[in-house]
């Protein structure tokens, strides 16, 4: 290479050093000073990884004094270039020697990098283009936010999330029956709102005991990192901000914390976008005396735009409390309880009409009259004729039924604010088969009970009952650790024999306390060497994950998982179908929670519930109350909470020492009250609401599309290539999983979310659902999003030179492939990406400036190309400069035309969709007061904002590939 003192060169391997100056040429070595960093580098003159920096007419260069020069011509003297042109500040003609160029110059634009010889590898150009296409594909999907979470594709859950998650500031009550996944629905909505930019700050309020469960659920299922706030955390955060709630975007806290006026005032002032309240049915309210908890949530709901309330079945705790929760969502709409009751009575006609439309039979005259009256502002006669016709296509009839049903849903009832699915309306649940195993009471327990009675001491009825239900705990209190209750308890003998006879089955065992769980594991291990693992509240999240993964492993995994009551909260093990209840909880809700670990939608097998119990004890009496009084083992019992509240005192007396007559009397009264409550709930079912809540065929269509996305092998290939190019180590672990680890040769110093010890991932949803320790990789996963951002946010792949070996074309034929990005800068919350997401525009020019992109697709063209090394590529670019400059101008013309078309289409789509939705909601508002004025105002403002953003749309050159034909 010809070097001269004062020449400006750039390092091909360390471009961050800026512009270098040749300061010494001696023998076969050259020394370059990089003034921006003050560093020297010495190179061999023949093999220096350096590129000469020479600008061309039309370029703008900056002097070391800060002023710019628009280059008109350049001359050379003694090996140094002198630039001549117009001074940016004075407008005068001036000259600037290259020695006086700004040292801090960076070649960020692709064309600058190309001419500076900063040429990237061929595969990096390809991955950059693929990344831009993936980002565009994700942004344009109307299912954005639904694919990424690690949840089963359950139609009613996806339907509710799809409907609610797309709204501006949704305010809804999620009231599905137990086991139908309210937490998942809330998580899906939160995930959608965050991913689409509709929300940025979220506050979740839960009971104390559920804070950890929500933290785990949000992280494991939705990749959302919430922070748990308690009083200690608030004090600690005060060092960073006067208002501790401003130190995090996503917060979980308990109602107890917010009962304190100081903390509530801070929460009210924290600008939340979305408020989520779990167990909202415990917020007590009467018109005269609302509870403190209710007042806390009411105050927050008045200042937070979006509110999700998660509650038990609305009728479970009475109609007045149901009204109170609706009042939190929209106090203007639900202002008077009596008016609400009167309106609810009018829904009965709507429900009857809806049920008729939802079936297949012809409509009765009464149903037709009812529909005509309910939809009086619309001519429904043509639809009725279609439904009643004899010889007509069934699909047309179904479409007519669906249309009228949608009209009813839009105009009547609480369908926009309340979603409630029941097991009666959602299919796919397994049977619950109950098996009880009586055993004689061990003498050791009887002795411990007598000693305890002699020692006396006043205890509450509840404490006495709890003691009677767990005799092993009482025994252990009187013995030292060398005397283990599990050595003589017949339930342990039974458990060992049961596991030995079901060796091929996974068995979940639940006991009330961690000590009991640990003792059972010790018994199984020491007596029979049975592989079991424990799961209790004293373990960290990582330890629980490992235990869950060990249990889930098909080969070499644990046969049994032994959980404590609290430790099992929030964890589901649908892959198992045998549940052993080693003891019974006193609360029916806790019993349902235990069974709910297996009895979830998505469970493939019938659930076998096994209960070993001690005869003639409190255990047997409680078993009878649950089984004969509530039928709580074989069916869910939504009224369990109410029944326990009503019969708690009688039940506790029976457990502590009641006789047979008292037990019989209790069972009779419980059965009678159970039937009353069940009948009332059946009568209260709102068929119209159920139809709206489960989504029908529309919900199934959403799930089918998501399932197809899961099978997208192109996505899997693109993501694997992305990690390959970044330099992420990938180890095939088997069982559809890969371990990702950072390597020493990664393209970027850090990869956020990829820990030093690695992360196990899978592209298979079923695998991820069965293993808590394996992440589900989709386009929405942070590891994929981060990878896309790392590539597209850097210079990676912005320039490339390739050879096309094709003897049908003359050698030396040049092609210039340009990738432009059409974009409009706007906040994510504006939703502009729905109409004009960042869109890659590909232009493929021949040397005459003709665009061949429509005739030559990217994939087939890319497969024919061969890479060239950087030095040869740089020489080819230098030799081709006279041809390239006019081609760039031509390429921009083609791209600008494409952008103009995209903007016009985006404007038309935006106007059509938002105007249509606005017109629909405005017309509905006249007949359905559930349409909030805020939603209408939001749509009007959004149309104006989006139009302004579209006017400011821009075109940016993102990547360049120069291709030359060779016959060698």
Swiss-Prot record:
Residues 163-332 form the Helicase ATP-binding domain. Pfam families: Helicase_C (PF00271), RapA_C (PF12137), SNF2-rel_dom (PF00176), Tudor_1_RapA (PF18339), Tudor_RapA (PF18337). Keywords: Activator, ATP-binding, DNA-binding, Helicase, Hydrolase, Nucleotide-binding, Transcription, Transcription regulation. Residues 491-655 form the Helicase C-terminal domain. A motif (DEAH box) lies at residues 278-281. ATP binds at residues 176-183. CDD domains: DEXDc_RapA, SF2_C_SNF. Its EC number is 3.6.4.-. One of its GO terms (biological process) is regulation of DNA-templated transcription. GO terms for molecular function: ATP binding; DNA binding; helicase activity; hydrolase activity, acting on acid anhydrides. Transcription regulator that activates transcription by stimulating RNA polymerase (RNAP) recycling in case of stress conditions such as supercoiled DNA or high salt concentrations. Probably acts by releasing the RNAP, when it is trapped or immobilized on tightly supercoiled DNA. Does not activate transcription on linear DNA. Probably not involved in DNA repair. Interacts with the RNAP. Has a higher affinity for the core RNAP than for the holoenzyme. Its ATPase activity is stimulated by binding to RNAP. Belongs to the SNF2/RAD54 helicase family. RapA subfamily. HAMAP family: Helicase_RapA. This is RNA polymerase-associated protein RapA. It comes from Shewanella sp. (strain ANA-3).
């Amino acid at each position: 290479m010809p070097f001269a003192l004062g020449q400006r060169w750039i390092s091909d391997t360390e471009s961050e050093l800026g512009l270098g100056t040749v300061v010494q040429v001696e023998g076969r070595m050259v020394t370059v000073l990089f003034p921006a960093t003050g560093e020297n580098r010495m190179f061999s003159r023949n093999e220096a990884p350096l590129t000469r920096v020479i600008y061309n007419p039309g370029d703008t260069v900056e002097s070391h004094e800060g002023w710019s020069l628009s280059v008109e011509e350049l001359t050379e003297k003694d090996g140094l270039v002198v630039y001549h042109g117009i001074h940016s500040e004075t407008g005068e003609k001036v000259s600037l020697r290259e020695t006086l160029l700004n040292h801090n110059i960076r070649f960020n634009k692709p064309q600058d990098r190309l001419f500076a010889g900063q040429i990237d590898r061929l595969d990096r150009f390809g991955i950059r283009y693929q990344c831009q296409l993936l980002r565009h594909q994700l942004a344009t999907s109307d299912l954005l936010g639904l694919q990424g979470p690690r949840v089963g594709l359950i139609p009613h859950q996806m339907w509710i999330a799809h409907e609610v998650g797309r709204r501006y500031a949704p305010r809804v009550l999620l009231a599905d029956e137990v086991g139908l996944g309210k937490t998942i629905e809330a998580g899906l909505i939160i995930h959608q709102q965050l991913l689409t930019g509709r929300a940025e700050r979220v506050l979740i309020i839960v009971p104390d005991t559920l804070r950890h469960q929500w933290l785990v659920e949000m992280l494991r299922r939705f990749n959302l990192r919430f922070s748990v706030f308690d009083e200690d955390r608030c004090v600690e955060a005060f060092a960073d901000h006067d208002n501790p709630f401003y130190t995090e975007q996503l917060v979980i806290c308990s109602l107890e914390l917010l009962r304190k006026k100081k903390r509530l005032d801070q929460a009210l002032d924290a600008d939340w976008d979305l408020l989520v309240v779990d167990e909202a049915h415990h917020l007590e309210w009467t018109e005269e005396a609302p509870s403190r908890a209710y007042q806390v949530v009411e105050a927050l709901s008045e200042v937070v735009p979006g509110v999700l309330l998660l509650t038990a079945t609305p009728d479970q705790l009475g109609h007045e409390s149901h009204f109170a929760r609706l009042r939190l969502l929209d106090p203007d709409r639900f202002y008077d309880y009596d008016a609400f009751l009167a309106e609810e009575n009018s829904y009965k006609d709507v429900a009857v009409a809806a049920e008729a439309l939802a079936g297949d039979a012809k409509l009765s005259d009464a149903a037709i009259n009812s529909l005509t009256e309910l939809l009086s502002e619309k001519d429904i006669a043509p639809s009725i004729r279609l439904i009643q016709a004899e010889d007509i296509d069934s699909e047309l009839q179904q479409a007519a039924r669906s249309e009228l049903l949608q009209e009813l849903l839009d105009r009547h009832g609480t369908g926009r604010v309340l979603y409630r699915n029941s097991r009666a309306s959602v299919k796919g649940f397994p049977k619950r088969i109950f098996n009880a195993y009586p055993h004689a009471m061990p003498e050791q327990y009887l002795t411990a009970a007598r000693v305890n009675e002699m020692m006396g001491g006043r205890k509450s009825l509840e404490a006495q009952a709890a003691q009677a239900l767990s005799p092993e705990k009482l025994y252990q209190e009187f013995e030292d650790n060398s005397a283990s209750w599990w050595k003589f308890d017949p339930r342990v003998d039974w458990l060992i024999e049961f596991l030995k006879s079901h060796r091929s089955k996974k068995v979940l065992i639940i006991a009330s306390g961690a000590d009991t769980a640990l003792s059972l594991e010790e018994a199984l291990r020491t007596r029979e060497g049975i592989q079991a693992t424990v799961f209790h509240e004293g373990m960290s999240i990582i330890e629980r994950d490992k235990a869950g993964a060990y249990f889930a492993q098909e080969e070499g995994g644990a046969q049994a998982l032994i959980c404590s009551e609290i430790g099992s909260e929030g964890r589901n093990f649908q892959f198992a179908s045998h549940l052993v209840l080693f003891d019974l909880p006193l609360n029916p809700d806790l019993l349902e929670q235990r069974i709910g670990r297996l009895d979830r939608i998505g469970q493939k097998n019938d659930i076998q519930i096994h209960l070993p119990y001690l005869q003639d004890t409190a255990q047997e009496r409680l078993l009878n109350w649950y089984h004969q009084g509530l039928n709580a083992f074989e069916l869910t019992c939504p009224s369990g909470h109410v029944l326990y509240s009503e019969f708690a005192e009688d039940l506790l007396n029976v457990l502590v020492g009641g006789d047979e007559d008292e037990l019989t009397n209790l069972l009779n009264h419980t059965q009678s009250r159970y039937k009353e409550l069940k009948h009332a709930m059946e009568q209260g079912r709102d068929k119209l609401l159920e139809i709206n809540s489960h989504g029908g065929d529309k919900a199934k269509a959403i799930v089918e599309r998501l399932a197809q996305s899961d099978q997208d092998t192109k996505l899997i290939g693109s993501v694997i290539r992305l990690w390959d190019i970044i330099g992420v180590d990938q180890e095939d672990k088997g069982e559809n999983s890969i371990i990702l680890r950072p390597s020493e040769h990664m393209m970027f110093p850090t990869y956020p979310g990829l820990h030093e010890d690695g992360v196990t991932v899978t592209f298979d949803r079923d695998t991820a659902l069965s293993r808590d320790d394996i992440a589900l990789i989709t386009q929405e996963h942070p590891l994929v999003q981060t990878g896309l951002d790392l590539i597209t946010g850097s210079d990676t792949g912005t320039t490339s030179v390739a050879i096309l070996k094709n003897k049908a074309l003359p050698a030396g034929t040049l092609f210039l492939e340009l990738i432009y990005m059409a974009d409009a800068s706007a906040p994510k919350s504006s939703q502009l990406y729905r109409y004009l997401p960042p869109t890659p525009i590909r232009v493929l020019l021949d040397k005459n400036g003709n665009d061949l992109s429509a005739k030559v697709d990217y994939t087939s063209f890319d497969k024919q190309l061969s890479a060239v090394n950087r030095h040869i590529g740089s020489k080819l670019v230098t030799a081709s400069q006279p041809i390239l400059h006019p081609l760039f101008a031509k390429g921009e013309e083609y791209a600008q035309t494409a952008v103009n078309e995209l903007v016009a289409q985006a404007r038309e789509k935006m106007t059509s969709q938002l105007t249509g939705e606005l017109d629909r909601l405005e017309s509905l508002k006249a007949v359905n007061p559930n349409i909030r004025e805020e939603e209408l105002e939001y749509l009007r403002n959004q149309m104006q904002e989006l139009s302004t953003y579209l006017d400011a749309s821009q075109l940016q050159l993102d990547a360049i590939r120069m291709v030359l034909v060779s016959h060698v």
